């Protein structure tokens, strides 16, 4: 029997329905609501079949945390489970497709790449979404185009070239202090061992901050951003490893996690608005201030602006720092390659009209290929963040429905033997000589794929190459004796947490 409130509502709307009709209508509406709710969280596995009606394999455990803490083990487990076929993993309540072969990636991006989109909050829940859910890397459609129209000019190839002098000054200063506070000392004079991941992270923070804040950047800013980076790392740890913060209702409660997020967002907003004000009052060149014009024009929201700068700075600090540290480690392990690189650098410097800008801009040098090879062999992340296809696909023989969140096993893709040969695990930069980039277009994830390539790609390449030149000018790199317990660490973060120690000896 309908309640008085329901009867009053129906009477007020002048509708006359039989009681059984009301019940049926309510049941239909409830069914639709339940269906929509479930379909927004689950991908139906019935659709994931091949032509023989065999279902795609599914990894049994929730991978929400382990893809960040045990990525290498998950990659191997996925290969053991499905072999050369794509497979499904669970990320909380969502299911995601894992692809890892060039043909998988090519089909995933075929025809509808420009219509791909990112799942809400990266499929990581409300807390992660509060931090980065509205950054430019997570936007799509018109919002993405408008945001990129304001951001791209400030991080273009041309803009990165204009920052070279400032980057060089910062890098030279960093190299001059590299011997301070070593992790280990040597009995040999001026020889020391350094935790290069930590030191390279410091350089990344300074350099990327300069690319964002330009002439407003100061030592005071550096100290503040260092503190903010520590706060950001705590938030990332909570977002990745705390199930409770996936709920937006939990995040409304006065918890320690909420206080952490509120503190970061309040300080981050105040800092950036202060930099914009300073740039305008003092007439200083500041890329962040130029991007902020997009907020004033209504093309970007303030959260989109702030989260995009967060993505550019705090996320990329870890990635850029890891890439640089691993290049030094690879060169330390391969003395022959290190000598060849030094010889190339000397040969280019001896050429008439040589400029460092022209050299680091070349895409066919051992310097450039050493950078690519290091990223290929030791990627900063084992798995990408999810991205959804707009139309149905046929990947690895399986029928993949539209709107399937998909992640890439970067380590397996970057070492696919069909492109890189049987020695795909080896650090061999010379393999790129004579290799048409079109050959590995879908077989190598470095700065992202398609239109969503890293916004800071141009700046990162300049910083990384200038740092390699500066370090190899002053030092030769060597492998120190290993200490017990060194290796990859099972800790949460955007990048793989590795011990990266290098021994530095004065260059002769």
Swiss-Prot record:
It is an enzyme of class 1 (oxidoreductase). The keyword Transport does not apply. Keywords: Glycoprotein, Iron, Membrane, Metal-binding, Monooxygenase, Oxidoreductase, Transmembrane, Transmembrane helix. Its cofactor is heme. It is found in: Membrane. It holds the Pfam family p450. It comes from the Eukaryota. Its EC number is 1.-.-.-. Disulfide bonds: none annotated. One of its GO terms (biological process) is secondary metabolite biosynthetic process. The chain crosses the membrane at residues 22-42. Disruption phenotype: Leads to normal accumulation of leporin C accumulated but to 30-fold reduced production of leporin B. GO terms for cellular component: membrane. InterPro entries: Cyt_P450, Cyt_P450_sf, Cytochrome_P450_monoxygenase. Glycans are attached at residues 53, 416. It is a single-pass membrane protein. Cytochrome P450 monooxygenase; part of the gene cluster 23 that mediates the biosynthesis of a family of 2-pyridones known as leporins. The hybrid PKS-NRPS synthetase lepA and the enoyl reductase lepG are responsible for fusion of phenylalanine with a hexaketide and subsequent release of the stable tetramic acid precursor, pre-leporin C. Because lepA lacks a designated enoylreductase (ER) domain, the required activity is provided the enoyl reductase lepG. It is possible that the dehydrogenase lepF also participates in production of pre-leporin C. Belongs to the cytochrome P450 family. This is Cytochrome P450 monooxygenase lepD. It comes from Aspergillus flavus (strain ATCC 200026 / FGSC A1120 / IAM 13836 / NRRL 3357 / JCM 12722 / SRRC 167).
């Amino acid at each position: 029997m309908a309640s008085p409130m329901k009867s009053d509502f129906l009477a007020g709307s002048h509708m006359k329905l039989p009681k059984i009709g009301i019940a049926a209508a309510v049941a239909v509406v409830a069914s639709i609501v339940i269906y929509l709710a479930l379909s927004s969280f689950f991908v139906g596995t019935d659709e994931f079949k091949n032509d023989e009606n065999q279902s795609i394999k599914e990894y049994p455990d929730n991978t929400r945390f382990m893809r960040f803490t045990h990525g290498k083990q998950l990659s191997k487990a996925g290969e053991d489970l499905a072999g050369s076929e794509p497979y499904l993993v669970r990320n909380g309540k969502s299911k995601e497709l894992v692809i890892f072969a060039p043909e998988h990636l090519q089909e995933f991006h075929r025809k509808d790449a420009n219509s791909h989109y990112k799942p809400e909050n990266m499929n990581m829940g409300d807390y992660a979404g509060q931090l980065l859910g509205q950054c430019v890397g997570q936007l799509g459609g018109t919002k993405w185009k408008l945001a990129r129209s304001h951001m791209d000019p400030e991080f273009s190839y041309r803009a990165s070239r204009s920052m070279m002098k400032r980057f060089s000054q910062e890098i030279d200063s960093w190299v001059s202090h590299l011997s301070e506070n070593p992790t280990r000392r040597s009995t040999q004079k001026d020889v020391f061992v350094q935790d290069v991941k930590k030191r390279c992270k410091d350089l990344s923070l300074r350099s990327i901050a300069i690319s964002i804040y330009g002439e407003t950047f100061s030592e005071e800013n550096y100290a503040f951003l260092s503190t903010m980076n520590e706060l950001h790392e705590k938030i990332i740890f909570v977002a990745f490893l705390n199930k409770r913060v996936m709920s937006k209702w939990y995040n409304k409660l006065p918890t320690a996690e909420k206080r952490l997020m509120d503190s970061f967002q309040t300080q981050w907003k105040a800092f950036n608005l202060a930099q914009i004000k300073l740039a305008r009052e003092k007439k200083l060149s500041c890329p962040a201030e130029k991007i902020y014009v997009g907020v004033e024009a209504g093309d970007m929201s303030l959260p989109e602006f702030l989260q995009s700068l967060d993505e550019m700075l705090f996320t990329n600090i870890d990635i850029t720092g890891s890439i640089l540290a691993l290049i030094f480690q690879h060169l330390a392990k391969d003395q022959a390659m290190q000598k060849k690189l030094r010889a190339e650098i000397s040969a280019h410097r001896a050429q008439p009209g040589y400029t460092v800008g022209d050299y680091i801009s070349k895409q066919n040098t051992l310097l450039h290929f050493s950078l690519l090879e290091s990223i290929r062999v030791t990627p900063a992340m084992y798995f990408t963040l999810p991205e959804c296809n707009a139309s149905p696909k046929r990947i690895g023989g399986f029928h993949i429905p539209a709107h399937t969140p998909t992640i890439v096993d970067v380590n397996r893709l970057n070492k696919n033997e069909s492109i890189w040969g049987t020695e795909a695990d080896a650090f061999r930069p010379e393999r790129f000589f004579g290799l048409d980039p079109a050959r590995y277009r879908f077989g190598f994830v470095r700065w992202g794929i398609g239109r969503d390539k890293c916004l800071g790609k141009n700046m990162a390449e300049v910083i990384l190459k200038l740092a390699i030149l500066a370090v190899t000018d002053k030092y030769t790199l060597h492998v120190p004796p290993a200490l017990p317990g060194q290796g990859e660490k099972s800790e949460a973060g955007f990048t793989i947490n590795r011990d990266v120690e290098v021994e530095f000896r004065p260059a002769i």
